[in-house]
Amino acid sequence: RDIVLAMAASTTSGINNSRFINADYAPTADFDLLLKAALYAKEKGINIKAGNVLSSDEFYEDDPDFYKLWAKFGVLCVEMEAAGLYTIAAKFNVKALAILTISDSLVTGQKSNSIERETTFQDMIDIALNIA
């Protein structure tokens, strides 16, 4: 399973646009946590990707090709929490890093079953526990 370290989080949500009075806010990870996670993964031989992710209000979009525009701009995956996590972390001046394991692929259509979801996320957990 691919592991993604979310450097930043774009969003389809309007919450930050509302919060920042019609302006765009770019929520980002804490650099120290990101660096520690990347270095730990490299040391342990865990393959990771680091980059921008998309926080979407809808996990299952009506348009199966909606991700293609985001992918063209280098967005690595779609999830639902990173933009909110990073925005609140910035508001309260705390560190945050979203570490994600790809469970379902919009590109290939591959989906994890419930047993895989329970048993194949160990590398992500290992990274998180060792950088905290």
Regions picked out by a protein language model, each given a short descriptive name:
Residues R1-A132:
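Glycine-rich phosphate- or other oxyanion-binding loops that anchor nucleotides, phosphorylated ligands
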